Amino acid sequence: MTWAERWATIERFLPQLWDGTLVTLQLVGLAVLIGLFFAIPLGLARASRHWYIRALPYSYIFFFRGTPLLLQLFLVYYGISQFEVVRKSFLWPYLREPYWCALITMTMHTSAYIAEILRGAIQAVPPGEVEAARALGMSRRQALQYIILPRAIRIGLPAYGNEVILMLKASAVVYTITMMDIMGVIRTINSRTYQYELFFFVA
C-alpha cells in the first residue's frame, strides 16, 4: 500500500475522527470545569488550620491522586453496577452509560489534583497581603473573597493549565469502556484497516 493510498484511507474516515475529537474535547472540557467547581471547597478545606476539616478532603485527594485513572474508571463503570440498589435507582439510566461514567470519573480525578493546586496557591499568597487585609478591618471571609482567592487563582492558573493538558492526554483510557472518543474511533478504524498511521495522525 502506497502512502497516497494510506492517506486516502485516513481522509475517508475523517468524519468519524472529527466526531471522536468532539467527544474527547467535550468530555475533558466538562470534567475540568465541573472538577474546578468541586475543587474549590476541597482546596479551602485542605488549607484549613484545623485537622478535622482537612481530614476528609485529604482522604479523598489521597485516593484519587494515589490510584490510576484506569482503575477508577473500572470501579465506576464495572464496580458500581454490581450493586442491585444502584441498578434499581434513578441513577441507573446514567450509570450504565459509558459517557456518564467517564465524565464522573474524570471529574472526581481532576478535582483532586485541582484541589491540591488551589491549596498550594492559597498557601503561597504572601502573608503580608493577608495581614494588610486584616489591618483594614476585613473579616476572614472578606479577606478570602477579595484578597486570598483572587491572588491564589492567579498563582495557580499555570498549574491548572497543565492539569487540563494532562487530562486531555489521560482521556485516552476511556476507550476501554467502549467510549467512542478519538482513541475509540482510531482503535475501531485500525481493526478494519490495520493502519498504524492513524495513531500518529491524531497525536
Over which residues does each language-model region extend?
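Transmembrane alpha-helices and adjacent helix-loop boundaries
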Residues: M1-A203
